[in-house]
Amino acid sequence: MIKAVAEQSGNTYMLDANVPPHITIAGFETRREDEVIEKLRCALSEQEQGTLTWAGVGAFFPNVIYVEPVLNEYLHKLSVIVNESIINIEETKLRKCYQPFQWLPHATIGKKLSEDEMVKAFMALQKSFGMFEGNVIRIGLAKTNPYEDIASWELLSKG
């Protein structure tokens, strides 16, 4: 979908910045990156994979378009686990808009879009988007602006 939006709108920011499809389940600033990694490693070591239903398309105006999963029990639980794992780490400040019950799960597929590019992005999705399911198989830790992967954890297979 990121590629389709880029091709239709002409805005290639997501591709140029190498931002992979993802849902942000916690946002924070810290000076204790190693401690965050260790806390998340412990918290996620027994976490199983789960299924999400992607049901809609939305926008953060004026220039972001996203696809939206249904906030089910599994996704809420992941949000709680990650946020609770890092909330008490010194010199770590959680971003309020990514905390449980204050968060809109989404996967950005177009960013820094002009008004015309936003219209074209919606047109691309109108032609191609339909409700679908996908599995959560990995949790990653990344820096933003520019995007940089820091760590990732493969989740346990169900069963």
What are these regions (language model features)?
Residues 57-60, 136-149:
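Glycine-rich beta-strand-turn "strand-cap" elements at beta-sheet edges
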Residues 60-63, 102-103:
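Acidic/polar active-site rim loop that often engages polyanionic ligands
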